[in-house]
Amino acid sequence: MDATAVLHKTDADAHITVEDLTMAYGDFVIQHDLNFTIGRGDIFIIMGGSGCGKSTLLRHMIGLKAPARGNVLFDGISYWDTTPVEQQRIKRSFGTSFQSGAMWSSLTLAENVALPLSEYTDLAPADITEVVSLKLSLVGLSGFEEFYPSEISGGMQKRAALARAIALDPEILFFDEPSAGLDPISSRRLDDLILELRDSLGTTIVVVTHELASIFTIGDNAVFLDAETRTMIASGDPRTLRDESPDPGVRRFLNRGEI
């Protein structure tokens, strides 16, 4: 740890702490006064209706956008108050899978997964090949190393993007709408894979989604962002929120499709 890293007192079990966070573009406030913690090894859901700021919150959490106010802490270290060297160390503990998948179309799956290994490690080419094969195997894509993204299905592309996200053995995985564009069967397979990764590797996972099936299948805890009040109006186990939240908007969101 960098000697100048700024430590804050947080919940002893908290891996990530969002503290008094306000997000804004200029004078326009997107969300304000967000406060929640994410436990180590939890699958945490950021949920809410369209346009409420879910993906924007993710961008603040992974260091792509600075908050108007407040902070994001990792193991008690304040990301936005620490040094650039410490910020890079924290970012190295992340794996991120964006909604588009962001695979390089001109590279094979193996070459895509190898990119972070080539960029951030001193592994020999033979060792990189071995790690790539392992990561693709973990997501059920063993034997597809030489395929290009255009040659596989959307669900397989999502899994390949996940293999790349876990290439550096991250402590924290961030997903932005992982089920977007997938059919229900492919979505369920991806949810099962996310659960397997958490259970086998102990990874803390943060997922932006509005898909109820995913929310209830994988979510340990959640925060609900409200577009009207521009703040969080509920947090906790999504199944408990569905049945017991005092806020009717939260119950409506989590009971969509119920008769």
Predicted regions and their residues:
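Helix-to-loop junction immediately C-terminal to a conserved catalytic motif
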Residues: 62
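Catalytic Walker B motif of ABC-type/P-loop ATPase nucleotide-binding domains
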Residues: 173-176
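Conserved ABC ATPase signature
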Residues: 148-152, 156
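A short, proline-enriched helix->beta-strand linker immediately N-terminal to the Walker B motif
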Residues: 167-171
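ABC ATPase NBD Q-loop/coupling interface
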Residues: 71-89
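Conserved ABC ATPase "signature" region
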Residues: 77, 125-143
